[in-house]
Curated annotation (Swiss-Prot):
PANTHER family: DIHYDROPYRIMIDINASE-RELATED PROTEIN 5, HYDRANTOINASE/DIHYDROPYRIMIDINASE FAMILY MEMBER. The lineage of its organism: Eukaryota, Metazoa, Chordata, Craniata, Vertebrata. Keywords: Cytoplasm, Disease variant, Methylation, Phosphoprotein. It is linked to Ritscher-Schinzel syndrome 4: An autosomal dominant form of Ritscher-Schinzel syndrome, a developmental malformation syndrome characterized by cerebellar brain anomalies associated with global developmental delay and impaired intellectual development, congenital heart defects, and craniofacial abnormalities. This is Dihydropyrimidinase-related protein 5. It holds the Pfam family Amidohydro_1. The modification Omega-N-methylarginine is found at R559. Its main location: cytoplasm. Signal peptide: none annotated. It is found in: Cytoplasm. Homotetramer, and heterotetramer with other DPYS-like proteins. Interacts with DPYSL2, DPYSL3 and DPYSL4. Interacts with MAP2 and TUBB3. GO terms for biological process: axon guidance; negative regulation of dendrite morphogenesis; nervous system development; signal transduction. The keyword Metal-binding does not apply.
Length: 564
């Protein structure tokens, strides 16, 4: 659909408007790409397209905070470019995506960002923004982070505690990056797994002859995720930087996050559709291609209670957002690791299915209501990205990114009918309640009743502002009230000890009665020939008369009777 949004008038009539905090019956009038009115018996100009939403929900368009379109990773390029990926998003009810820029080590962040913009701008069908990965650390990287925030509309950076020798940062580097994020008001996204132990676990599995996809689950147990999660929360707390954990996959990591929030630490967290709905039993499937299709990191967990638990954490706000982490590869690409599971490209599809699957397992499953569904799929992301209430809410003045959602309609997911790329679907044959009937992006109907009507390049890049209130407002206040200060005291005016050995470890001047001896001449090893101990010559007890022997009548412990 090439028509300019300024010339389109739309009236959504008879529906129930759902925001993250309330639901009410209202009509919605859209013009010039903006929601102009919300209410009953609206006075609107003529010529508007009327969409009957009777019995339907009118919700904010979804915001998918983690997608990887046109990205090369582990020697394979994701099968979806920005056109096909954003098209699939719109068909599924998502109207904004956040992509990833992943620079190689020792390369420019700004150059990688500009390259990604060059790939995306001519292709996108919906609004988008970009995270930038921090894969190495140097003063130049810090300067480029400032440039990206100040001039390029970036407000989030992603770090990895895994992918050793590729993207992994050491703790000291994480500390510096988090300090930099806090100073410029950016969101620090962290993939938390203990990369050192993951690498050792992979070696051990391969040594045992385990080469199949199950090696992913075996080498990355949930305790490695929990440990890294606790560690990075600690580092973030020391730097007073808000932390955003991504791809949370386990009960253990969820418990660490819940405990940190209870302690008042500023922690946000995101899980994925796959982790919140599937299990790692698929890695043990007899069909190698089936098992490999589910390879993602952290891996899906064997404990069948995990997905239900993560959905509960989404419902109670321990986890704030659910993303697709969409990065599909074909079976042929996955087969690059047929002899070695460490070479299977990590990634699964899901940008098209995210909304319906979460509705089915979350709302229909009784874990959350329609308002919480809007929060985890749209509103919370908008708040974190500093876009709320321009996006993520149905109110006058907001962007006209709107979905007419039918909670009663059903669909059966299948790779044969999907718009997103790849030759496999994780949710094959899943029957979902909750279907987007109409998707409106930037005030234009782009999808209606199964028909897609949008040309590539009609989406726009959304610059993101730094210091989002949802995380930084409380931290700024904390720094004012809890600022560390030194003690005001009278200066010390007494004597100061002189350093005995300049250039070596400082130590006080020895007292006069402190026994000393010359420094050894043999590299720290004691030379017995230099010992001051002697068995000859004058001794302090020479004046005491010596006896050949002495009989002890009452030895310690009392007398004893002789046996012999």
């Amino acid at each position: 659909m090439l028509a300019n949004s300024a010339s389109v008038r739309i009236l959504i009539k008879g529906g129930k408007v759902v925001n993250d905090d309330c639901t009410h019956e209202a009509d919605v009038y859209i013009e010039n790409g903006i929601i102009q009115q919300v209410g009953r018996e609206l006075m609107i100009p003529g010529g508007a397209k009327v969409i009957d939403a009777t019995g339907k929900l009118v919700i904010p368009g979804g915001i998918d905070t983690s997608t990887h379109f046109h990205q090369t990773f582990m020697n394979a390029t994701c099968v979806d470019d920005f056109y096909h990926g954003t098209k699939a998003a719109l068909v599924g009810g998502t109207t904004m995506i956040i992509g990833h820029v992943l620079p190689d080590k020792e390369t420019s962040l700004v150059d990688a960002y500009e390259k990604c913009r060059g790939l995306a701008d001519p292709k996108v069908c919906c609004d988008y923004a970009l995270h930038v990965g921090i894969t190495w650390w140097a003063p130049k990287v810090k300067a480029e982070m400032e440039t990206l925030v100040r001039e390029k509309g970036v407000n989030s950076f992603q770090m990895f505690m895994t992918y050793k020798d590729l993207y992994m940062l050491r703790d000291s580097e994480l500390y510096q990056v988090l300090h930099a994020c806090k100073d410029i008001g950016a969101i620090a996204r962290v993939h938390a797994e203990n990369g050192e132990l993951v690498a050792e676990g992979a070696k051990e599995a391969l040594d045992l002859g385990i080469t199949g996809p199950e090696g992913i689950e075996i080498s990355r147990p949930e305790e490695l995720e929990a440990e890294a999660t606790h560690r990075v929360i600690t580092i973030a707390n020391r730097t007073h930087c808000p932390i955003y954990l991504v791809n949370v996959s386990s009960i253990s990591a969820g418990d660490v996050i819940a405990a940190a929030k209870m302690q008042g630490k500023v922690v946000l967290a995101e899980t994925t559709t796959a982790h919140a709905t599937l299990t790692g039993l698929h890695y043990y499937h007899q069909d190698w291609s089936h098992a490999a299709a589910y390879v993602t990191v952290p891996p899906l967990r064997l404990d069948t209670n995990t997905s239900t638990y993560l959905m509960s954490l989404l419902a109670n706000d321990t986890l704030n957002i659910v993303a697709s982490d969409h990065r599909p590869f074909t079976t042929k690409q996955k087969a690059m690791g047929k002899e070695d599971f460490t070479k299977i490209p990590h990634g699964v599809s899901g940008v098209q299915d995210r909304m319906s699957v979460i509705w089915e397992r979350g709302v229909v499953g009784g874990k959350m209501d329609e308002n919480r569904f809007v929060a985890v799929t749209s509103s919370n992301a908008a708040k974190l990205l500093n876009l709320y209430p321009r996006k993520g809410r149905i109110i006058p003045g907001a962007d006209a990114d709107v979905v007419v959602w039918d909670p009663e309609a059903t669909k059966t997911i299948s790779a044969s009918t999907q718009v997103q790329g790849g030759d496999f679907n994780l949710y094959e044959n899943m029957r979902c309640h909750g279907v987007p009937l109409v998707t409106i992006s930037r005030g234009r109907v782009v999808y209606e009743n199964g028909v897609f009507m949008c040309a590539e390049g009609t989406g726009k890049f959304c610059p993101l502002r730094s210091f989002p209130d949802t995380v930084y407002k409380k931290l700024v206040q904390r720094e004012k009230t809890l600022k560390v200060r030194g003690v005001d005291r009278t200066p010390y005016l007494g004597d100061v000890a002189v350093v005995v050995h300049p250039g070596k470890k400082e130590m006080g001047t020895p007292l006069a009665d402190t026994p000393t001896r010359p420094v050894t001449r043999h590299g720290g090893m004691r030379d017995l020939h230099e010992s001051s101990f002697s068995l000859s010559g004058s001794q302090i007890d020479d004046h005491v008369p010596k006896r050949a022997s002495a009989r002890i009548l009452a030895p310690p412990g009392g007398r004893s009777s002789g046996i012999w």
